[in-house]
Regions:
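Intrinsically disordered, metal-sensing/regulatory segments
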Residues: 1-142
Length: 142
């Protein structure tokens, strides 16, 4: 009662696609999979926090969080299973499609929406700090 079923279904679809991207990353290499898993875990943290509202409290929040975690894990395993024997071209194409979808979402939806709120210099600092952290992780894991 009071839960937006359409929003929850879309969230599960989004998280499933994120899981497939993580699985494709692990099929490419362990390093790629780890970088994608770390990067997308930040997105999933904020997605989970955004799902919590006044209409959803208590055990429903816990249940939704567990089901989202199972969703991303299951799709990661499926992506890795089906792409483990695939060639580099197929994996690269799937990763390119996934990255293009993520970039489209960021540029078309999130950046436009972000500029409707007053921007603070600390927000920009945290954005660039996040990029530097993930870039450093990739550099040091090589």
């Amino acid at each position: 009662a009071g839960m937006n079923v359409g929003l929850i279904a879309a969230t599960f679809l989004d998280v499933g696609i994120d899981g497939l991207i993580i699985g494709a990353g692990f099929a490419a290499s362990q390093e790629t999979g780890m970088v994608l898993a770390l990067g997308l875990s930040v997105e999933l943290l904020f997605l989970g926090l955004a799902m919590v509202s006044d209409t959803m409290k208590g055990w429903r929040v816990l249940l939704l969080s567990v089901l989202l975690a199972v969703d991303v894990l299951a799709f990661s395993l499926l992506g890795n299973y089906f792409l483990a024997g695939a060639g580099h071209i197929a994996i690269s194409a799937i990763l390119a499609f996934g990255v293009a979808a993520l970039l489209y979402l960021v540029t078309d939806e999130l950046l436009i929406e972000a500029h409707t709120v007053a921007e603070k210099p600390s927000s920009t600092l945290w954005l660039f700090a996040g990029f530097l952290i993930f870039w450093s992780i990739q550099l040091y894991s090589a």
